Each structure stands twice: as C-alpha cells, then as structure tokens.
C-alpha cells in the first residue's frame, strides 16, 4: 500500500496548522494581591527553574504504540516518518490514501508515539467544531479540516490522549451527522518548541478567556477582533458574568492572542488569559491511572526536546500549568505560621490565608513543586490540629513574574536573615520595622546565634525589604540577606500513620541558615557579608 504526502509548502498552507512563532513572551503585571495578571509583556520564567527541577527525570526508554519498549538508540536510528512495514489489516479504509495526503495507518515498527489522529468519511459541509465536540480525551495542539477530502486531522499534545481518542472512536464506532466516520493515524510531526514552552510554563491551550466584558458584546464582534490571530473553533459568551471563551484551532493562535490583544486599546482593560480546552473535559480520572490500557508513555516524543516534566504527564496540570494550591477545612484557631510549617516541597511565591472562611491559597514558585505538594497531600493526607485538610487547585496563578524569577535565580526567598543581632533587636521591633514592606508570617529570634529571621507571606515583600531595610536607621551594621524558606524542605510524614503533619514544637531553628559561600541554594544579596 502506498500513500502520498504533500510538499512542505502545501502542508504549511493548510488552515489550522501550527504557524512559526517568534521567541515567546506572555503579558502580565502583578496585581495588588501579588498574583500575575495579563496586561503587559514580559519574559517567561527561565527554563532552568522548571527543567532543572530535581523532579524532572530523563526517560531511559519509551513505549511503542504496541506496548513494546525500545531504546533511545533505536529511536535515533529510525526515520522521522516511517513509510514501510505498515500493517494493512489495521487500515480503517482500503482507499484511505486517496482520501487525504499525510494519512498513515498504524505502522508496525514506529519508533515514536503518534499524536495525530485522522478522521475520514465525514459528511459534506461538516464544521470542525462538530468534530472537536466528539473529543473528550485531552487537550489538542492543533486541528484542521480538508473539506474537499471530507476528512480532518486532530493533533494532541500528548500521544496517550491521541491513543485514547483513537481507541474510543474505533470501539464505539464514532458517528457524526448519522454517518460512521473512519479513524486512523496521521503523519507525525514535531511540535513547535515555543508552544511546548508556553504549555509548560503558562498553561497555554487553545482556549482564550476574556473577562470584564462590556454589556451587549456579541459573538460577531469578538470574532472580528480575534480571528486575525488564527482560525476559531468556537466562541461561547456567558452574558450574566460578562465573560467569554474563544477556542482557536491551534494553541499557537491562542498564544498570539494572549500576547497581542492586551495591546489593543479596545481590549486593554479586559481580563485576557488561557481557559481550559473543551476537549479535555473527560479527564476527571487522570490518564496516568490507566497507562497500561493506553500503552503509551506521556510527554513529548520528539527527539531533541527536553525530557518530559511531571507537570506535562498529569492531565490536570496540562490544562492549567497552575502554581496555586487550595487548602480547605482549616481549624478556626489555626495560624498562618502553622500552615507554613505543614507546607513542604518547594519555595513559595505567596500564601494567602482567609481565616474567616477557613481556607488558604498557597502559590509556589515552580508548578512542579505545586504538583508535588498537591499529589503528596492527596496521597498521604495533610493534618493540622488533628483535622485533615481538603486539598485542591486554586485559581490559575499565571506565569511567575519576570522580576520574581530573576530574584529567585539569585537566591531570593520570602525569608530574611538578620545577622550580628544585638540586644537592642527584639521580635517586637523587627515586626514593627518590617511590616511596612508587607504582611509578616512570623519572626524567629535565636539569641545564642545572634541572628533572627523574618518570614513574609509574599516573596515580593521580602525582595522589597532586602532593597530598603538598609536605609532604615539602626540596620547599618547588621548582616542582612535571604534565608532559607522552610517550605522548600522535603515533606515530613508520620511514620505510624503515613500522614503529612505539622509538629507544634518550634524550638528547633527549622529555617536557620548561616550565610557563607558554598552553601547550596543560598546567595546573599545586598548584604555586608
């Protein structure tokens, strides 16, 4: 059996294909609450902060579409687009090669998990939004339709989601407008690196959220302003909430819209960010619970890209890229200090405790750390004051602000170290002098070591304090720098109950760091050391 593929030029001209992207920036500013909001362009979080995470492991082998392991050597030696060894018996249509260029049935010896699904035998004039309404297995990178061939191609972010859709459509005999469609595998192609980076760091997807819309705005008006960024799949307006969701046919177009739409004076005062891909609504039970059924390793199977992050292997985080974890069912007498004593696994960007509502929102610097805390707390449970807490995902935090990312790369944390402390320095004085820079979580003083620590609820407040505290009278002779955020320590479990818990014994200096060169992860800033 033979099949023809279009030239590279014709492939690029197909509507809905992922276009070339310039170096990526994501609009944002920092609101009064310290949360990222999209308004002005800034550089993304340095990749080292995520890809350098100790939780990101390089895979030693991958799994083929038939569940057979193969090595990276075999992968590198294999052709990018296999054209021989197809199992003809698996072809869903005997004449499928004549239906659409670029279509390939499932090969026997493929060395890359395939992420593009072919949908053929479509009824004439079928709109692509009806086709995508049948997809519920995971977020889509791009989709395009060839009306003259009565077929469409759907390219997923994760090959396991493509396989799940393929199997589901084949088993249930997918029907559109009363016609049973044919499913097969499309030709594999590399994902755009800028798109992968945006998915990894910002939770980018095809869906663009529009908030704070004026009364009476229409779908036609939204389409007119957003269609220049790329082909649109669907627009949904929620009139009573003055919000809308615009699904593009590819993530690249959504990224461009999020970047450039805030620069339009008409949209400058609107809330613009990523929503949730409607094709991922079926991910109530994450795919990593059923990898054996799918037979495909999650992540991006493209040679030359970084190894997959745990964030990208968990569908809940593919959809959001979230750094904020919700904590509920908190005892009324619990203090923010006790919550921070229980949070472990990564540096905190900020923590917001709503004591009257018995809830708290913890935002990490790294989304991998947020996922790790979320997963550990749900597996082992998190207990404070003998009450098991409820753990969930908070509202999307957005990307880490660039100024915070640069400060973290230089050793910043929300903990301020004050060395050479004398008898004139007291906890009360520290609270009074530092509270002008932001909300303080707690102050710890160690007389025997002549040092103290001031922990803020926000990393931005600590950065502000480091920059300005030396200008305050009486602090000229103190050694001032960043300390160690105790929330970055490994999780602690109760060996008897295997439950994450917090000790009430605060006599140990859990955040004590004596600043000196050579300490891993510590870099004094604006200090007299």
Curated annotation (Swiss-Prot):
GO CC terms of this entry: cytoplasm; cytoplasmic stress granule; cytosol
Task performed by this protein: Negative regulator of sexual differentiation. Acts by repressing the transcription of meiosis-inducing, ste11-regulated genes until cells reach a critical level of starvation. RNA-binding protein that preferentially binds poly(U).
Lineage top rank: taxon: Eukaryota
Chain intervals with Low complexity compositional bias: 1-13
Modified residues (Phosphoserine): 93
Source species of the chain: Schizosaccharomyces pombe (strain 972 / ATCC 24843) (Fission yeast)
CDD domains hit by this protein: RRM1_MRN1, RRM2_MRN1, RRM3_MRN1, RRM4_MRN1
Keywords carried by this UniProt record: Phosphoprotein, Repeat, Repressor, RNA-binding, Transcription, Transcription regulation
Keyword match Transcription: yes
Gene3D superfamilies: 3.30.70.330
GO molecular function terms listed in the Swiss-Prot or TrEMBL record: mRNA binding; poly(U) RNA binding; RNA binding
Chain ranges of the RRM domain: 115-188, 206-277, 323-396, 414-485
Entry keyword annotation includes Hydrolase: no
Protein name according to UniProt: Negative regulator of differentiation 1
Stretches the record annotates as Disordered: 1-26
InterPro entries: Cwc2/Slt11, Mrn1_RRM1, Nucleotide-bd_a/b_plait_sf, RBD_domain_sf, RRM_dom
A Gene Ontology BP annotation from the UniProt entry: negative regulation of conjugation with cellular fusion
Lineage: Eukaryota, Fungi, Dikarya, Ascomycota, Taphrinomycotina
Pfam families: RRM_1
């Amino acid at each position: 059996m033979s099949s023809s593929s279009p030239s590279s030029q014709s492939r690029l001209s197909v509507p809905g294909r992922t276009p070339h992207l310039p170096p990526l920036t994501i609009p944002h500013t920092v609101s009064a609450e310290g949360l990222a909001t999209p308004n002005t362009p800034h550089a993304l979080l340095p990749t080292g902060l995520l890809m350098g995470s100790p939780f990101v492991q390089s895979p030693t082998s991958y799994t083929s579409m038939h569940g057979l392991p193969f090595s990276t050597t075999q992968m590198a030696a294999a052709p990018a687009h296999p054209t021989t060894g197809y199992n003809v018996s698996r072809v869903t249509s005997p004449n499928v090669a004549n239906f659409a260029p670029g279509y390939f049935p499932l090969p026997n010896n493929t060395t890359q998990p395939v992420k593009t699904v072919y949908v053929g035998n479509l009824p004439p004039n079928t709109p692509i939004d009806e086709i995508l309404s049948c997809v519920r297995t995971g977020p889509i990178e791009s989709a395009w339709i060839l009306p003259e061939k009565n077929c469409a191609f759907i390219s997923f972010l994760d090959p396991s989601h493509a396989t799940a859709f393929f199997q589901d459509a084949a088993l249930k005999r997918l029907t559109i407008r009363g016609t049973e469609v044919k499913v097969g595998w499309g030709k594999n192609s590399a994902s755009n690196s800028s798109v992968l980076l945006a998915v990894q760091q910002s939770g980018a997807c095809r869906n663009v959220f529009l908030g704070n819309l004026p009364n009476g705005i229409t779908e036609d008006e939204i389409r007119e302003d957003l269609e220049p960024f790329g082909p649109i799949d669907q627009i949904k307006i929620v009139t009573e909430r003055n919000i809308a969701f615009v699904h593009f046919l590819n993530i690249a177009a959504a990224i461009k819209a999020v970047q450039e739409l805030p620069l339009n004076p008409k949209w400058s005062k609107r809330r613009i960010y990523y929503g949730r891909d409607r094709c991922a609504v079926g991910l109530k039970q994450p795919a990593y619970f059923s990898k054996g059924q799918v037979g495909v390793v999650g992540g991006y199977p493209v040679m030359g890209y970084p190894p997959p992050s745990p964030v990208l292997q968990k569908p809940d985080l593919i959809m959001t890229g979230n750094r904020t974890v919700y904590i509920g069912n908190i005892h009324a007498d619990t203090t923010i200090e006790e919550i921070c004593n229980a949070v472990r696994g990564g540096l905190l960007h900020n923590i917001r405790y709503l004591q009257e509502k018995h809830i708290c929102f913890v935002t990490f610097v790294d989304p991998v750390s947020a996922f790790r805390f979320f997963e550990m707390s749900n597996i082992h449970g998190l207990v404070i004051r003998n009450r098991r807490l409820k753990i969930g995902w908070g509202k999307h935090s957005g990307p880490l602000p660039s100024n915070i990312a640069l400060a973290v790369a230089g050793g910043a944390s929300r903990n301020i170290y004050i060395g050479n402390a004398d008898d004139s320095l007291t906890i009360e004085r520290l609270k009074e002098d530092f509270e002008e820079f932001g909300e303080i979580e707690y102050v710890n003083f160690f007389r025997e070591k002549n040092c103290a620590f001031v922990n803020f609820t926000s990393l931005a407040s600590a950065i502000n304090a480091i920059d300005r505290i030396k200008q305050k009278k009486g602090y000229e002779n103190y050694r001032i720098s960043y300390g160690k955020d105790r929330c970055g320590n490994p999780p602690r479990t109760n060996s008897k109950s295997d439950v994450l818990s917090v000790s009430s014994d605060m006599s140990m200096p859990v955040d004590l760091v004596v600043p000196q060169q050579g300490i891993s992860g510590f870099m004094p800033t604006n200090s007299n050391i």
